[in-house]
Amino acid sequence: GKSGAIIEVNCETDFVAKNDEFLALTKGAADLVVSANPADVAALSVLPFGESTLEAARTALVGKIGENMTMRRFVRTEAKGKLFSYIHGGAKIGVLLDLVGGDEQLGKDLAMHIAASKPKSLDASGVSADAIESERRVAIEKAKEAGKPEAMIEKIAEGSVQKFLKDVTLLGQVFVKA
């Protein structure tokens, strides 16, 4: 199968985010995640990179550029289908999509949609019970404050929960290109 990775590396300014050496370090770190499959950022930082380790390369670049940068988190996946990636907004938003079925255009469009709409999960089954309950409580509170009749409050709350689920699930959202 094909492996892919996405990594979050934070810096302080857009100037550094566009710097070729910073971009090379970030790409190198993502490549290391794919090839070495480290357990976490600490394990990633001690992996061989260039003449030394990734952490040594990061520290040297911080010294050279004069701005801090941190490897915050990463995700690695073994694709079941075809991997698509989409990086948006000067690399501030990134999507790594494993698509089983579909074609090249669908993969690109879905990755772009995910970047734009930021779904929390594929469908309602992936939304935590706590998030749903919190949404329900807020809706009940608002309905009571608005003086809605007691008999309607539960229906109003259920409608709010359904709208929330449409907004936060990939399958519930209106497709960006629609």
Task: Locate predicted features.
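N-terminal assembly/interaction segments in proteins that build large macromolecular machines
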Residues: 1-178
